[in-house]
């Protein structure tokens, strides 16, 4: 019978947990599910991702709470879709990243795999990032290897753009498996969602309508772009440690205190939102235009794929070199499920004892088998 792998993903946006049951060769999605975080768990996880003095007790409590939610979700996925547990070979659980510091050689994801295995009776592959980091890599992004396996084309250059909390690109040169590379370009939903929730009470800016109502603030944009991450050369990765509301508030305060740059008429929440959106699209454009790919196709996944204003702005920015911008749904995989499917694929690679990182992407010393197993 066809082997099925379950992928579980919680990203920097922290809007919930995505579950995918998939088989490969060829890719087939058997079932999907999303479970939202309980507000208390989300608050705990959010607090743990921000720099500061975080209690070990808080981390332990969140580690257990998230694992129980994941275990419950997997059982629900299996039962609601009448999947046969005997053909499910493994679960690939990314966990929630609460700290990612490649410059210091460490990354930490929580969501106890032992609890998940105990609740489901299925082996869990977890802790995917640290082996790459031990080999000198960034430990991220890991999904470009999956993008290469599923989306690379023999005659057309493609870019897979993931718009989660952080934006990252996988650059797939036509017919050149050895030429694949990718990296984080900077914040995507992580700042826009937080700013939107603060001022509107909504968890995200639906279709980018609020940002579309505003106008980017040039002086503020220049301050935001001065963050050292944007001047780094790949391989590079980032997260909530670098881009968060505290950082944004600091930049806003500096701008407001600059008598030469500050204009009170520009200082509206919707203009700040428009500025954050432009920060995202400008970094993506820079990443694509500085690549060796002259023209081709951009396919977008992640929550940002549903931000129609962002995609319109991106099409406009990439018009010069005739890049098309579409959802990965055109390629047969919904943008909602790409990352969770990638971790099902990573679980399969581990079970087959095959490498899953791309040194050209992460900067690792070589190809490595990623993850550790918690057996039944």
Curated annotation (Swiss-Prot):
It catalyses: 1,6-anhydro-N-acetyl-beta-muramate + ATP + H2O = N-acetyl-D-muramate 6-phosphate + ADP + H(+). The keyword Hydrolase does not apply. It is an enzyme of class 2 (transferase). Keywords: ATP-binding, Carbohydrate metabolism, Kinase, Nucleotide-binding, Transferase. Gene3D superfamilies: 3.30.420.40. Pathway: Amino-sugar metabolism; 1,6-anhydro-N-acetylmuramate degradation; Cell wall biogenesis; peptidoglycan recycling. Its EC number is 2.7.1.170. GO terms for molecular function: ATP binding; kinase activity; phosphotransferase activity, alcohol group as acceptor. Pfam families: AnmK (PF03702). ATP binds at residues 11-18. GO terms for biological process: 1,6-anhydro-N-acetyl-beta-muramic acid catabolic process; amino sugar metabolic process; peptidoglycan turnover. HAMAP family: AnhMurNAc_kinase (MF_01270). Belongs to the anhydro-N-acetylmuramic acid kinase family. Catalyzes the specific phosphorylation of 1,6-anhydro-N-acetylmuramic acid (anhMurNAc) with the simultaneous cleavage of the 1,6-anhydro ring, generating MurNAc-6-P. Is required for the utilization of anhMurNAc either imported from the medium or derived from its own cell wall murein, and thus plays a role in cell wall recycling. This is Anhydro-N-acetylmuramic acid kinase. It comes from Acinetobacter baylyi (strain ATCC 33305 / BD413 / ADP1).
């Amino acid at each position: 019978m066809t082997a099925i792998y379950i992928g579980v993903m919680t990203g920097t946006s922290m809007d919930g947990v995505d579950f995918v049951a998939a088989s490969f060769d060829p890719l087939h999605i058997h079932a999907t599910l999303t479970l939202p975080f309980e507000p208390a768990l989300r608050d705990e996880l959010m607090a743990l991702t921000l720099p500061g003095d975080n209690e070990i007790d808080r981390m332990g409590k969140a580690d257990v709470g998230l694992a129980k939610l994941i275990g419950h979700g997997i059982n629900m996925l299996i039962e609601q879709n009448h999947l046969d547990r005997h053909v499910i070979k493994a679960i690939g659980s990314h966990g929630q990243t609460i700290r990612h510091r490649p410059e210091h050689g460490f990354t930490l994801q929580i969501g106890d795999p032992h609890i998940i295995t105990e609740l489901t009776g299925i082996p869990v592959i977890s802790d995917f990032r640290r082996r790459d980091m031990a080999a000198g890599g960034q430990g991220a992004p890991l999904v470009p290897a999956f993008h290469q396996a599923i989306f690379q084309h023999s005659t057309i250059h493609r870019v897979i753009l993931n718009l989660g909390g952080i934006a990252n690109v996988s650059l797939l040169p036509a017919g050149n498996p050895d030429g694949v590379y990718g990296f984080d370009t900077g914040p995507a939903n992580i700042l826009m969602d937080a700013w939107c929730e603060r001022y509107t009470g909504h968890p995200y800016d639906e279709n980018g309508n609020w940002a579309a109502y505003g106008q980017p603030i040039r002086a503020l944009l220049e301050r935001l772009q001065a963050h050292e991450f944007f001047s780094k050369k790949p391989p590079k990765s980032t997260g909530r440690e670098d881009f968060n509301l505290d950082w944004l508030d600091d930049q806003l305060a500096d701008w407001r205190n600059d008598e030469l740059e500050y204009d009170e008429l520009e200082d509206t929440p919707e203009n700040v939102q428009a500025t954050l959106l432009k920060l995202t699209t400008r970094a993506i454009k820079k990443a694509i235009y500085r690549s060796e790919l002259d023209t081709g196709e951009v396919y977008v996944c992640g929550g940002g794929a549903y931000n129609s204003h962002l995609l319109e702005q991106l099409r406009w920015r990439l018009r010069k070199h005739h890049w098309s911008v579409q959802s990965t749904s055109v390629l047969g995989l919904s943008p909602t499920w790409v990352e969770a499917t990638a971790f099902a694929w990573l679980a399969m690679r581990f079970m087959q004892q095959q490498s899953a990182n791309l040194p050209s992407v992460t900067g690792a010393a070589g190809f490595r088998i990623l993850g550790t197993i918690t057996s039944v």
